[in-house]
A protein has these predicted regions:
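Acidic, Ser/Thr- and proline-rich intrinsically disordered linker/docking segments
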Residues: 23-32, 36-112
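Conserved beta-hairpin
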Residues: 1-32, 36-39
Length: 112
């Protein structure tokens, strides 16, 4: 499972070696100032829409990589229908990050 690392300056989605292969992408790092909204959701997969390009997806099982739709570009790391953190971003390559985590409320509390 990916780790959501939060420090004073940035938020980093740290991927495992397998997730990097699934996503065809490395870790994603964005400045904290780019985060315009953050929320916890009960099912991260329900937040990811559009066409996968590139990445890996099996409905209800895994969504890792980039998804594009009319609302923008989402980078997702979702394993099963589990709780996740959704970060809406401004001025970045991705419009949203969706990451399944063990305790999404804790991550939300540590961000603006």
């Amino acid at each position: 499972m990916a780790n959501l690392l939060i420090d004073d300056d940035a938020v980093t989605v740290s991927l495992s070696v397998i997730e990097k292969a699934e996503a065809l992408h490395g870790d994603v790092r964005v400045p904290r100032t780019a985060v315009v909204r953050v929320r916890a959701v009960p099912d991260g997969m329900a937040e990811v829409h559009g066409l996968r390009m590139p990445g890996t997806g099996f409905p209800g099982v895994i969504m890792v990589g980039t998804w594009r739709d009319s609302e923008g570009v989402t980078f997702a790391v979702c394993h099963g229908r589990r709780p996740a953190v959704v970060l809406d971003l401004a001025g970045q390559a991705y419009d949203r990050l969706v990451v399944t985590v063990d305790n999404p409320e804790e991550a939300v509390a540590s961000l603006p």
